[in-house]
Amino acid sequence: MAPPTQRRYTNNRKRRGPREVGGAKTGDGLTRIMKRIRDLERVLKRPVPMDEQKRIELERAVAAYKVQAEDIIGDRKNKKNVEKYRMIRFFERQKASRKVKQARKLVEQADSDAKKKDAEALVVKYMADLAYTIHFPNDIKYISLYPNGAVDETAESSKQREKMRAEFAEQIKNGELDVDLERAEQVATTKKSKKKREAGADEEVKGDDEDDEFLEKAPKKAKVEEEESDDDEEDEEDDDDDDDSDDDDSDDSGEPQMEIKRTADEKQTKEEESDSEEFVDESEAESEGKPESEENSEDQDDESE
């Protein structure tokens, strides 16, 4: 039995990422960056004399790779938190928007300065809540603005929530933060209408596909019909040719038939003439034979007497 063929592994695949020591590209993955950091740190820890300029370049490369790794980790964490707390922030944004509208109505309906002042304070408070739901940092865990009882509430989370509320309220009072209520409502309604738009887009794409399919089939169908019409025309031409040939055959065969008929008529006339001649001969013979019989009968009578 022949020995199994040994598989050869080669390093012919394309390298991904930078091959140089210095500088870190943005497109590198986190695993490759961390591996590069470990390799460079291992080189720096070797008890081998190294040029000072090269050591500085390696240290700068390590620092650049670490910054890039931190950015990638932060982006991944932000995306994770956005996806995780997306629904709760959406509902709390809607609730804060309703409260802002109610507070603004109170300001318009206030019949005294004291009530108007209290209503304006409520507007600022609820605007801060709306800013809280919009501008809450994504790199930390989202703390619910309206906690569900004592289950979600802790002393630390309550303290952090009130701190961020106060910061947003201060920024709104100083004009440093502008919260657009219409934009917040648009963001809230966008998610509701997203499915409708996607459904409409699917129907439009389906209609376009049907139109494309019809346009693709139409030339083929027209071509098939054209071929069928050509075949029908060819069949009609063949039938006409057959009819013409039949007429020619009938014309060609008509002359012999007429000759046969003419000979038959001539033969019949000859037979009729011969029959008439025989009849005449017989009649003459009868007329000649009658007097003789009468004479014979008279002679017999005389003898008997």
UniProtKB/Swiss-Prot annotation:
<keyword id="KW-0539">Nucleus</keyword>
<feature type="compositionally biased region" description="Acidic residues">
    <location>
        <begin position="294"/>
        <end position="305"/>
    </location>
</feature>
<dbReference type="GO" id="GO:0005730">
    <property type="term" value="C:nucleolus"/>
</dbReference>
<feature type="compositionally biased region" description="Basic and acidic residues">
    <location>
        <begin position="258"/>
        <end position="271"/>
    </location>
</feature>
<dbReference type="InterPro" id="IPR019310">
    <property type="entry name" value="Efg1"/>
</dbReference>
<feature type="compositionally biased region" description="Acidic residues">
    <location>
        <begin position="205"/>
        <end position="214"/>
    </location>
</feature>
<feature type="compositionally biased region" description="Basic and acidic residues">
    <location>
        <begin position="215"/>
        <end position="224"/>
    </location>
</feature>
<feature type="coiled-coil region">
    <location>
        <begin position="51"/>
        <end position="121"/>
    </location>
</feature>
<feature type="region of interest" description="Disordered">
    <location>
        <begin position="1"/>
        <end position="28"/>
    </location>
</feature>
<feature type="compositionally biased region" description="Acidic residues">
    <location>
        <begin position="272"/>
        <end position="286"/>
    </location>
</feature>
<dbReference type="Pfam" id="PF10153">
    <property type="entry name" value="Efg1"/>
</dbReference>
<keyword id="KW-0698">rRNA processing</keyword>
<keyword id="KW-0175">Coiled coil</keyword>
<comment type="similarity">
    <text>Belongs to the EFG1 family.</text>
</comment>
<comment type="function">
    <text>Involved in rRNA processing.</text>
</comment>
<dbReference type="GO" id="GO:0000462">
    <property type="term" value="P:maturation of SSU-rRNA from tricistronic rRNA transcript (SSU-rRNA, 5.8S rRNA, LSU-rRNA)"/>
</dbReference>
<feature type="region of interest" description="Disordered">
    <location>
        <begin position="185"/>
        <end position="305"/>
    </location>
</feature>
<protein>
    <recommendedName>
        <fullName>rRNA-processing protein EFG1</fullName>
    </recommendedName>
</protein>
<feature type="compositionally biased region" description="Acidic residues">
    <location>
        <begin position="225"/>
        <end position="254"/>
    </location>
</feature>
<dbReference type="InterPro" id="IPR050786">
    <property type="entry name" value="EFG1_rRNA-proc"/>
</dbReference>
